[in-house]
Amino acid sequence: MTPNLPGFYYDRERRRYFRISENQSISTTGTTNQYRKDNIKRQCVEENYDKKFSMIKKKRQQTLQKYKLSLLNPLERAFRPLSYEKYMIGLNMQYASHSLTEGHHSHSSANVKSLNFPHRIQIGVLANCILLVTQEGCFHSKLVFATNKGYVAGFSSLDNFSEENFFTGFSMAELNPMLKYKSEPTDVFKTMKLERTVAIKEGPSHYFYHNVNTRSNVHTFAIFLQDFSSLKLLKIRQVKLKENCQVHDSLVVGDTLIITVNYRCHFYDLIPETFPNPYIFSPAKSSRKHKSRSDITSLSFCLQEDALSPLKKTNTGVFYLGYRNGDSMAIVFTNITNMTLQYSKTNGMTSESRNQPIRNSLKSVVSIKALNNKGLILISGMADKENVQQLVIADTFLEDILTEIPVVSFKTKFLNVTKDTEILEISDDGRYFIYGSTSARDGKGDFEVFCTTLSGNLDYEKSEGGNITLYPIGGMKNYCRLENFQFESIHLHSAFIPPRYVNPFDAVEPLGEESSTSPYDIPEEALSQKICILIRREDDPYNGANIFITSALT
């Protein structure tokens, strides 16, 4: 990592120091800070967002009322040409939101449980990443966390978050004597990844953990298997990079580790006990409009489905790359089941002909993730013209077919979201995703929930060119409906959307009294999608207690 020099800041793109001028300093005293140019701009963006969002919500309620009235007409029910199921999820979302805003008890349910962390590792305060390890075979589902002290720990049960069910699956302090690169007791470890690996063969699921020592720039990679009451450490590898080498993203595909180092991708083989030298792959230039290469800020992978034969299994995989200059690219790899370093070298010679640029209007890409295996991807970054955060859906299958593709974007209230502060979690089916920032609300964190289908939004903005803009269906405040709580006292650790077949709690109790049912209410099976949130409450009588919330997403 680059050292901090007093009076200077380091520009990662140009890889040099620049002096901090006086007009760049931010005053924290008095009330003059609210009149600064950046704060005035932020207020204008938020006011414009609130104005448009209120109009969309009003149109949603009008659509809801019009549709519910049509259900009362028997002729409408008998001869209506459109399927009711198309509106089921969207109407349910708006009904729950309407009940909440009007002060009524909606049918959206929530369950709240306290997490009893041992104080010795302070995981409750330091948890910066969360992962749900789903049930597999005879192993039960587990809740796993990572901290900036180099711990991977969690609970072996989703029903009882007591200290008896607490386990530590990985500890940098305990493994320090056997590691090649030692760490100091005061070192801080930044969590880069905690996720399930991409499986290219049948077998038990593997889980990937990646941290970096912010002092020495040593990257540690660990692979886990699920055990009966904890996680079993399968492999651990380390890489020490130079100070000017910046790693922005990483992932594991099969037995191959890929990390982005500046504008290159390093491929490592995880099978040998000692890390061999990597195969360094330099993708083609992201676009012609930029003369120099730009850093790769995001990396994603997806097994591609055969568009002509959806039921036929394919060995084709696609790497999606996002760049700091706003470009993005898809690289197709064939015969992915035999992916080794030698395979990567062989494909690297011919992969340039399979590079597919992805069109977008972003000035800088923060994250790029696949929504499904049919070519739909979600890109987050800074908008080119408006200088605000933007979320865009791109269809890579249509890039070479159509000259003009309608853009589907999502309006968010968050500004200045970086790789370190971004929260972006997508459901398994790609229908919903969470987008937020841990630096929002003065560092307390916040998020919004979006639906990627038009029927789930009811109303939206559509331009003359066919571009569609969607707004969130809910926010953190809607799902954290706790008893006697003040939103200002809540600190967000993380949030995610579990698979539909996983219920984090056996019994989910609704908050308050149940609302009266109606023959026109949405059936309960349509409400099976959940959202899980890990927060910390600073108000009395909790005083820093960690709360795990499971709420109905719709």
Curated annotation (Swiss-Prot):
It comes from the Eukaryota. This is Uncharacterized protein YGL176C. The lineage of its organism: Eukaryota, Fungi, Dikarya, Ascomycota, Saccharomycotina.
